[in-house]
From Swiss-Prot:
PANTHER family: ALPHA-HUMULENE_(-)-(E)-BETA-CARYOPHYLLENE SYNTHASE (PTHR31225:SF93), OS04G0344100 PROTEIN-RELATED (PTHR31225)
Protein name: Terpenoid synthase 29
Keywords per UniProt: Cytoplasm, Lyase, Magnesium, Manganese, Metal-binding
Organism listed in the record: Arabidopsis thaliana (Mouse-ear cress)
InterPro entries, sorted: Isoprenoid_synthase_dom_sf, Terpene_cyclase-like_1_C, Terpene_cyclase_plant_C1, Terpene_synth_N, Terpene_synth_N_sf, Terpene_synthase-like, Terpene_synthase_metal-bd, Terpenoid_cyclase/PrenylTrfase
Domain notes: The Asp-Asp-Xaa-Xaa-Asp/Glu (DDXXD/E) motif is important for the catalytic activity, presumably through binding to Mg(2+).
Enzyme class, broadest EC rank: lyase
Entry similarity comment: Belongs to the terpene synthase family. Tpsa subfamily.
Tissue: Predominantly expressed in flowers but also in siliques, roots, leaves and stems.
GO biological process: diterpenoid biosynthetic process
Pathway linked to the protein: Secondary metabolite biosynthesis; terpenoid biosynthesis
Residues the record lists as binding Mg(2+) 2: 358, 362
C-alpha cells in the first residue's frame, strides 16, 4: 500500500535513516563544534545550564526581561517506554488492504445516484478516509458538477444541500450559495421551520464556516444555526438523540473547519458508530485507518523524543517551552495521513527548534545579545559567534545542527533546494524577531498598524508552509516555492490570522512578563479601549482573514496544485485549536492535553 513502512524501534522513515552521513553540508556544524569555544565541546555540553539567578554583566542587564517560567512538559520521555507491536501493525495493514476495495466499490457503485455519491464522499471526509480515494473522488465531483443544476433542482433537504455545498467547495468547485435561497422566507430570513431539522441545522452551521467575504448568506446562516443549536443543547426537552446532542455540543465547542482533520475524524467515528443504519464496512475501515495512523504517530513521537532527549535543550535552556508533543500535534494540522510521516517529523523538529529561538528572542536574551544572535543568523555563519554568550552558542549550534541533519536526510531525495528555501525564511523571521525584541526591551508600544507590519513577519506562516513542503513527495518543488515566494494572498491572510489569534491568546502571559509588543495591547493603547473590546475587534479581523483564505483556496485551483492549497487550508484550522482558550501551546493542560491523549494513547476498539 502507499502508506509508509516504519521499522518500529528503528530510526528510519521511508527507509531513509534519520541521520545520513555526507561529505558535504550546507551548514557550519563542524566548524562550530571545533571552534575555540570550550563550553560547546560535546564532552562538556551536559554540564552547562542557564540559571535565571546567575550574575549578569551590565550589558546583560540592559533592557532585560523577567525570566519566564513555563510549566514542564506533560510528556517527558513517555513515548520511549511505549512498546509497539509490529505484528499488530502488519495485521492492521492487511485488514486495510482487504477492506479498502470494499469501500471503493461502494463509492464507485453504478447503482448510486450523484447525490448519494456526494453524501458518501462527505462521510469519507468526515471519518478521515477520503485520501484513500482522492482520484476517484475528484473524478466523481468533476462529472457531477457539470450537471449540478439538474442534481439540486427540487431538492428541499437542508442537510443534503449543505453537504453538497461543503464537498464541492472542499474540492475546488464553486457551487453558488444561491442554493440556500430556497430555505429563506419572503422576509429574506431563514425559515423557522428549519430549527426542527437538527442534522440539517448542524450541517449548515458547519458549512457556514467556509464562507467567503462576498457570501453574506453564510454569515446569516452561522448566526441563525448557532443560536438555535445552542438553545437545543442547553434545553432539557430536546427530542434529539443523546449521541446527536453530544455531536452538536462538540461542533459548537470547536467547529469542523476550526479543528484539525484527524481530531474531527476521531470524534466523528464515535458519533457515526451510534447512528442507526451505519455502514459496517465503512465504519470498520475508518477504525482500522485511525489505528493505523496512530501507530505512525507514536513511532514518530518515539523518534522525536529520542532526538529531543539527545539535544537536552530543556535542561540546558530552562527558559524555553518544552513542547515536543505539542509540536507534533501542530505538525498533524497540515497533514495527518500516514504517507506524510517523514514530513511531520521534519515539521516537528524545525518547529521545536524555532520555539527555542523564539523564546530566546522573546523572553530571555538582552538587546545586545539579540543583535549579536541576529547577525550570526543573517550570515548563517559562526564567524561572529565569539560575541555570543555560551547559552546563545548552544541555541545557534542546535539550530545549525538540526537544519544540517535535515539537509543530510534530504540530499539523497534530491530536496536540497527546499532546505535552502527554509533557511532563507528563517533569516527573514529572525530579523523580525529582533525588531519585536527591541520594542519589548525598550517598552515601546507601537500603533496597531505599525505592529502588524512587523508582527506578521514573526508569525512565519510562509516559513511553516515551507517546512511542510520539505517532506512532501507529491509536489513540484520549484513551482511550489516560486508560488510561495510570490507572497500569495492566501499566505498573507494565513499569517495575519495566526498573528491575531496568537496575540489574543498569549496576551496575559506576555504582559505579565513585560512584553508590551503584543497586537492586542497595541490596539488597546491606540484606541483607548478595554481588553474585551479590543479582543472583539481582533476577532472580527481574524474571521474576515479566514474568509479570504477560503476564497483564495477556491480561486487558486486553476493554477496551484490541490496538495499545496490543502496545506494552507489545513494550517488555518490549527489556530482555533490552540488559541480559543488562551495559549494552548504554551499551557496545554486541559483541552490540548485531552486532544493529544485521544490521538496518541487510545486506539479505537474494533468491536
Amino acid at each position: 500500500m502507499e502508506a509508509i513502512r516504519i521499522g518500529f524501534g528503528l530510526p528510519n522513515v521511508h527507509s531513509v535513516p534519520l541521520c545520513l552521513t555526507t561529505t558535504r553540508c550546507l551548514f557550519p556544524r563542524q566548524r562550530l563544534l571545533h571552534s575555540h569555544t570550550p563550553s560547546w565541546k560535546p564532552a562538556k555540553q551536559q554540564d552547562f545550564f542557564v540559571a535565571s539567578s546567575s550574575k549578569k554583566s551590565s550589558d546583560d542587564l540592559e533592557s532585560s526581561l523577567p525570566t519566564p517560567h513555563f510549566s514542564p512538559s506533560l510528556w517527558g520521555d513517555h513515548f520511549l517506554s511505549v512498546s509497539l507491536n509490529r505484528a499488530e501493525f502488519d495485521e492492521l495493514e492487511r485488514e486495510i488492504e482487504t477492506t479498502k476495495p470494499l469501500a471503493r466499490d461502494k463509492l464507485m457503485s453504478s447503482e448510486s445516484s450523484d447525490k448519494e455519491k456526494i453524501r458518501l464522499i462527505h462521510l469519507l471526509v468526515s471519518m478521515g478516509i477520503s485520501y484513500h480515494f482522492d482520484k476517484e473522488i475528484q473524478d466523481i465531483l468533476k462529472h457531477s458538477f457539470t450537471k449540478l443544476d439538474d442534481i439540486i433542482v427540487g431538492e428541499d433537504d437542508l442537510e443534503t444541500i449543505s453537504i453538497m455545498f461543503e464537498v464541492f467547495k472542499l474540492y475546488g468547485h464553486k457551487m453558488s450559495c444561491d442554493a440556500f435561497d430556497r430555505f429563506r422566507g419572503n422576509d429574506g430570513r431563514f425559515k423557522e421551520s428549519l430549527v426542527r431539522d437538527f442534522r440539517g441545522m448542524l450541517q449548515l452551521f458547519e458549512v457556514a464556516h467556509l464562507g467567503t467575504p462576498c457570501e453574506v448568506i453564510m454569515d446569516e446562516a452561522l448566526s441563525f444555526t448557532r443560536n438555535h443549536l445552542e438553545s437545543l443543547t442547553s434545553g432539557n426537552a430536546s427530542t434529539a438523540s443523546p449521541h446527536l446532542l453530544k455531536h452538536i455540543q462538540n461542533s459548537l465547542y470547536i467547529p469542523r473547519y476550526c479543528n484539525i482533520e484527524v481530531l474531527v475524524a476521531r470524534e466523528y467515528i464515535s458519533y457515526y458508530e451510534q447512528e442507526e443504519g451505519h455502514d459496517e464496512i465503512l465504519l470498520k475501515f475508518a477504525k482500522l485507518n485511525f489505528n493505523f495512523c496512530q501507530f505512525h504517530y507514536v513511532q514518530e513521537l518515539k523518534t522525536l523524543t529520542k532526538w529531543w532527549r539527545d539535544l537536552d535543550l530543556a535542561s540546558k535552556l530552562p527558559y524555553i517551552r518544552d513542547r515536543l508533543v505539542e509540536s507534533h500535534l501542530v505538525a498533524l494540522g497540515p497533514y495527518f495521513e500516514p504517507h506524510y510521516s517523514l514530513g511531520r517529523i521534519i515539521v516537528a523538529k524545525i518547529n521545536m527548534i524555532m520555539v527555542v529561538v523564539d523564546d530566546t528572542y522573546d523572553a530571555y536574551a538582552t538587546l545586545p545579545q539579540v543583535k549579536a544572535l541576529t547577525e550570526c543568523l543573517q550570515r548563517w555563519s559562526i564567524e561572529v559567534s565569539d560575541k555570543l554568550p555560551d547559552y546563545l552558542r548552544i541555541v545557534l549550534g542546535s539550530l545549525f545542527d538540526v537544519m544540517g541533519e535535515i539537509e543530510r536526510e534530504m540530499r539523497p531525495l534530491g530536496r536540497l533546494y527546499r532546505v535552502k528555501q527554509v533557511v532563507e525564511k528563517i533569516k527573514i523571521i529572525t530579523k523580525a524577531y529582533q525588531e519585536i525584541a527591541k520594542w519589548a526591551r525598550t517598552g515601546h508600544v507601537s500603533t496597531f498598524d505599525e505592529y502588524m507590519k512587523v508582527g506578521v513577519l514573526t508569525a512565519g506562516m510562509a516559513d511553516y508552509a515551507a517546512y511542510c513542503f520539505i517532506g512532501m513527495e507529491d509536489i513540484n518543488e520549484k513551482e511550489a516555492f516560486e508560488w510561495l515566494n510570490s507572497n500569495p494572498l492566501i499566505i498573507k491572510h494565513l499569517t495575519a490570522m495566526f498573528r491575531l489569534a496568537n496575540d489574543v491568546g498569549t496576551y496575559e502571559t506576555e504582559i505579565n512578563r513585560g512584553e508590551v509588543a503584543n497586537g492586542l495591547n497595541c490596539y488597546m493603547k491606540q484606541y483607548g479601549v478595554t481588553k474585551e473590546e479590543a479582543s472583539r475587534e481582533l476577532r472580527k479581523m481574524y474571521v474576515y482573514r479566514k474568509k479570504v483564505v477560503v476564497e483564495e483556496f477556491m480561486n487558486s485551483h486553476d493554477h496551484v496544485p490541490r496538495q499545496v492549497l490543502l496545506r494552507c487550508l489545513n494550517i488555518a484550522r490549527i489556530f482555533d485549536v490552540f488559541y480559543t482558550e488562551g495559549d494552548g501551546y504554551s499551557e496545554p493542560k486541559g483541552k490540548i492535553e485531552h486532544f493529544m491523549t485521544s490521538l496518541y494513547l487510545h486506539p479505537i476498539p474494533l468491536s
